[in-house]
C-alpha cells in the first residue's frame, strides 16, 4: 500500500471495498496494529500511535468468527481476555443482543448470526475505541444481516470508530457513512454513502464484484430508499 491518507470521526462507520488483493486486509490489519511492516503515521486524538498502541485501542472481528471464539460458554466468551469486566455491563449487553438465553451455551452450538452477535457483544464489552469488521454478513440471511446492521449502528451511537470490509452493497447502504475503495494497494476513491453518490457507489461495487478472484457472487439486496 502507498499514499493512503484519511481521517475518521468518532461514531463514523466506514466501508472498505475492492477486489481480492486490492489492499483491504493489509489496511485493516495495519489499523489494528496487526501488520507491523508499514511506514507512515497513525494518530488518535492528535497522539501518534505505534502498532502496540493500536493493538490496545482496537478490536477486529474476523470473517470467520469461529477463529476467535475460545471460551466454553457465551458469557465466558464475553469476558475472555478482558481485565476486570463489569458484570452489569456483560448482563446488559447479553440482554440487548438477545443472547441472555444462550449465556451458558457453547459458542460453537450457535447459528452463524448468533455467533456474529457474540463477536459484537465482545466488541461492546472490551471498551476498545476502534473496531474493524471483516465481511460481517458473509453467509448470513437477510434477517441476520439486518440484525448485524442494527448492532453496527448501536456501536456507532456509542462513539466507536468502525471500519467494515465488505462486498455487501445493501449492508453498506444500511450502515456506512462513506466508502473507501482500494485498488492495487492504493485508495483512489473516498465516497459518501448518499443518494447523490449512488451511481458512483454502484460502479465501485460492480468493479469489486467483477474482478478475477471473487469466489462468491452475492446478489445485491440494495434498495435506493435505504440510502
List PLM regions with ranges:
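Helix-to-loop junction immediately C-terminal to a conserved catalytic motif
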Residues: 32
